Design a protein with these regions (language model features):
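Phosphate/NTP-binding elements of NTP-utilizing enzymes
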Residues: 1-249
């Protein structure tokens, strides 16, 4: 999938540069056997950057793009309504794409998409799934990881659930949180440790968008660093206005 669909204007738009890089990195970095190198991807990004569109695109790539039979892709979040946000964007992408709409069956009442050529599905899970086991997971889209009340759902969906698949992907995407006891903070710290060379895990991919300690928050360069879609999904005038207001406080 080389493009996303703008669900508000119903016009096709190109991937934003940062979105394209993430897609290329995750799906284009392969092991010698031809399967994906990365099993876990952690993306931390502020609101209004195109997070849901990216997550929906990844879900559809996992559903339709790998050519594997009977793949199971799940949408998870702190509650079903949150997980439904990404699903709804994916539904719009399917409806506005003739190639997908011919091949994907939409079951809105079940929050489920079925890719008919391989009998694969993408489904939103309910909150009580943390008490269940037995998933044969090809992909998990974990939205707003920082809102998880504990690590139970994360563990159920990532520990052993994809062992029978050749290239499972756990795609974790979230805005920043502040609970240092959460699973999100644990994954965030792992991402920093790998980035700084303190840990090594070739199966783990991460991108964190945000200002570092000591950055000048009044600098447009820092605004762009923390908001990769600045000027596209986020108007620069709004950021300027917010900055000026903050200076007065």
């Amino acid at each position: 999938m080389s493009e996303f669909f703008n669900c508000w204007t119903k016009k096709r738009i190109d991937l934003i540069d940062w979105q394209e890089k993430i897609i290329r990195d995750i799906f284009g970095t392969l092991k010698p056997n031809g399967y994906r190198q990365f099993n876990t991807a952690y993306i931390e990004i502020p609101k209004k950057q195109g997070k849901s569109e990216l997550a929906a695109g990844v879900a559809l790539l996992l559903l339709c793009g790998d050519g594997e039979e009977r793949t199971e892709v799940y949408g998870c979040a702190a509650d079903r309504n949150q997980a439904k946000i990404v699903f709804d964007v994916a539904v719009d992408m399917v409806r506005f794409c003739p190639a997908l709409s011919k091949r994907v069956k939409i079951l809105e009442s079940q929050k489920k998409l079925i890719y008919k050529p391989t009998n694969s599905f993408y489904q939103v899970l309910s909150a009580d799934v943390a008490n269940k086991h037995g998933f044969n997971t090809h992909g998990v889209i974990f939205d707003e990881l920082h809102t998880q009340p504990n690590r139970k759902l994360y563990d159920v969906m990532t520990q052993g659930s994809g062992d029978a698949r050749m290239q499972p992907l756990y795609f974790l995407i979230t805005t920043a949180g502040n609970d240092t006891n959460s699973i999100c903070y644990e994954i965030h710290q792992k991402a920093l440790d790998i980035d700084k060379g303190r840990k090594i895990d070739p199966t783990f991919y991460s991108v964190i968008y945000g200002a570092d300690e000591g950055d000048d928050w009044t600098s447009p360069k820092v605004w762009k660093k923390a908001n990769p879609s600045l000027g596209i999904t986020v108007g620069i005038d709004k950021v300027k206005s917010a900055c000026e207001s903050a200076k007065q406080n």
